[in-house]
Amino acid sequence: MMFFKRTILACTVALLFPALPSYAEVGAENGNSAQAEKPGLWKRFTSNVAETWNNSPNKDLYVPAITWHNRLTYSQEKIDSYNERPWGGGYGISRYDSDGDWHGLYMMVFKDSFNKWEPIGGYAYEKIWRPLEDKDFRLGLGFTASITARDNWNYIPIPAPLPLASIGYKQLTFQATYIPGTYNNGNVFFGWFRWQF
């Protein structure tokens, strides 16, 4: 029962945190026009989260695909004991901005390395490149500002800012991150498919 309560708490926090900037005053008047032209990083971040929350035309289905523990940083005994098939699922909303870059809010639940449920949710951004003539093919590089909770940490919600990379064609995208760490801890490649509808 405690697992369920903490999981619900973690999911609620993960969904509410990115929504908070949508309640902030987005277009406050400021006498300094130079500052209005170039908002700071935090202002830009909260504005993008609010815009994504309020004006995202796309719905996304997330399907976890792989967790891979870096063989150079784990003992064989640990590798043999870990789950590397993170079945689960998730849902999100997303949009492309005027520069063609991708913004998303998401919630996903998957089986972690110990085969226990792990929720994660938050905001994600990717700078998008379309290197081919076929503009449906794209590459992305960015970050996710998320919150997760794990069984081995008693499902206490913790922030998880992580790098993000992707390769996509039309509605299907493979996204991935790398969780840094120390020997026998962290250093995990985590990838999932995202289907936009």
Curated annotation (Swiss-Prot):
Acyltransferase found in the keyword field: yes
Site, Role in the phospholipid gating: residue positions: Y183
Record site feature (Role in lipopolysaccharide recognition), residues: K78
Predominant location category: membrane
Cell compartment(s), UniProt: Cell outer membrane
Keywords: Acyltransferase, Cell outer membrane, Membrane, Signal, Transferase
Functional note: Transfers a fatty acid residue from the sn-1 position of a phospholipid to the N-linked hydroxyfatty acid chain on the proximal unit of lipid A or its precursors.
Protein family: Belongs to the lipid A palmitoyltransferase family.
Protein name: Lipid A acyltransferase PagP
Organism, scientific name: Serratia proteamaculans (strain 568)
Lineage: Bacteria, Pseudomonadati, Pseudomonadota, Gammaproteobacteria, Enterobacterales
Underlying gene: pagP
